[in-house]
A protein has these predicted regions:
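Conserved SAM/SAH cofactor-binding pocket of Class I
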Residues: 29-116, 122-126
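Conserved beta-strand signature within the Rossmann-like core of class I S-adenosyl-L-methionine
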Residues: 156-162
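Class I S-adenosyl-L-methionine
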Residues: 177-227
Length: 232
């Protein structure tokens, strides 16, 4: 953590390293960030939300892609401070507004794009930093999807970044994401996959090696279902 804050973390999708404070999740698994950088944006995207911004890396990538206004949120005060420093370092601070809040910003127009990289494992965290990885009973994921449509333009998109590790170790059913999205008025329009390249995928002594070797990280593109869009 000391090195992450002082020497920085190299992010291939960004022009220079970012600083990560102690207690803030470090995006050392960067494979999904290339999806954020290269996936086609919704047409005429003027306003985007980065929900659970952490170090601010996703919001920074969106700003560098030319989205003129981004609102990034987090409940963690250290994350807000960390993201502020990184936005200044990358020169994107004028495009991004930070708000310390639970999930969605309080007052805003409807977004054209909402990006969220929630915790991937439905289990209980044992320390504050583990809340970035563990989500008991999928509570944060369910809350996010249950509210997303209220904050999204009818033709807007939700980009949900998730690993399928929980599905591979039988903590979630295989069709969990599309079914949960449908439950909350969203439909899947695309899914873009990438394979993680972190060291644990090659560690044969890891109890989860077999699952990690098959792990896929996906960017799920969601949009309001037709019946919901008609009401918006």
């Amino acid at each position: 953590a000391y090195a992450w804050q002082n020497k920085g973390v190299d992010i291939p999708a960004l022009p220079e390293p970012i600083s990560v404070r102690y207690g803030v999740f470090s995006p050392i698994r960067g494979e999904y960030l290339n999806l954020i950088k290269t996936t086609e944006l919704p047409p005429d995207t003027r306003l985007a939300f980065d929900i659970g911004t952490g170090s601010g890396v996703i919001a920074a990538i969106l700003a560098l892609r030319g989205i003129p206004k981004i609102i990034a949120t987090d409940t963690n005060e250290d994350a807000i401070l960390c993201a502020t420093e990184n936005f200044m370092r990358l020169g994107v601070q004028t495009a991004i507004r930070l708000e310390q809040t639970d999930l969605f910003p309080s007052q805003h127009p409807l977004a054209d794009l909402i990006v969220c990289n929630p915790p991937w494992i439905p289990a209980r965290p044992t320390s504050p930093i583990e809340t970035a990885v563990y989500d008991p009973d999928n509570a944060m994921l369910e809350k996010f999807l249950s509210q997303a449509v209220q904050h999204l333009n009818p033709n807007g998109q939700v980009w949900l970044v998730m690993s399928n590790l929980a599905e591979l170790v039988k903590l979630r059913p295989q069709d969990f994401i599309p079914q949960l999205a449908e439950k909350h008025g969203l439909r899947v329009i695309d899914r873009l996959d990438t394979r993680p390249g972190h060291a644990k995928t090659k560690n044969t002594h890891d109890p989860l090696h077999e699952a990690r070797a098959r792990e896929v990280t996906s960017l799920w593109k969601l949009t309001p279902s037709q019946r919901v869009a008609a009401k918006l």
